[in-house]
Amino acid sequence: MTLILLPPSEGKTGRARGRSVDLESLSFPELNPTREAVLDTLAKVSASGDAFGVLGVGPSLAHEVERNIHWRTEPAVPASELYSGVLYDALGYATLSPGSKRRANSRLLVVSGAWGALRMGDRVPPYRLSMATTLPGLGPLASVWRDPLRASLDAAVGKSVIVDCRSSTYAAAWRPADELAAKWVAVSVVRERGGVRSVVSHNAKHTRGLVARYLLESGKDPGTPKALQKLIGEQWHAELDRTGAGWTLTVVEHD
């Protein structure tokens, strides 16, 4: 089964009413001790005078920082609704066919600075926390999550091809190693104009969302990086290169 890794969006969509988070109902419950340590520390930081500086946000996001304080009681929403923005708009979970949604629920994993890893059906409250954050008493979040995620995700991957649509900030928290790396494919997006290639961040997020949607809608399960390249190549110009322990699939868009 193909596994697709996504980053969270910065913005989150919440609800005014609803049940609060039930930690035991979340995927990867073995991550709960780390989740609670991170979120309780986040709540303390968010209630302090240093909140904006530690979290790297401005006063205009004060309402989002305030929600961090009440993470245990805020209404929880499915990850499929929680995350928004360019990548998730392109993915378009709400408009997937029933079969594609079932595949999304089992194949999509969001790597999160607050929750470690989530599936689409996991219900959590909105939060404001980047994986690039260093929390007092815990340290850099990518380091905090590295060992717990390795234990959980290494087991979850099995023999799957791993399609990595994360940014480098979130990839730092977990990178497949050893034999798992042989099926780890990071998706890169470049724009080619007049023979010159460049990376456009907004465009790259959009295309990664489209790639994830295409994989879900295809109903196919490429068993190797080369089979993945062939499948993506039906829709885009795609180049596959071995990069270190894993692979990079470069999607080339032409102007």
Question: Residues of each region from the PLM?
Answer:
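Generic signal for short, ordered secondary-structure residues
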Residues: 17, 67-70, 90, 190, ...
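A glycine-rich, hydrophobic loop/mini-helix early in the fold
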Residues: 51-126
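Internal, well-folded beta-alpha domain core
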Residues: 93-255
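Generic hydrophobic, helix-prone segments enriched in Leu/Val/Ile
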Residues: 37-42, 64-65, 228, 232
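A broad, low-specificity signal marking well-ordered, structured residues that form hydrophobic/aromatic
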Residues: 4, 86, 185
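N-terminal "assembly arms/tails" that initiate or stabilize quaternary assembly
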Residues: 1-61
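Generic preference for well-ordered secondary structure
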Residues: 22, 26, 67, 71-75, ...
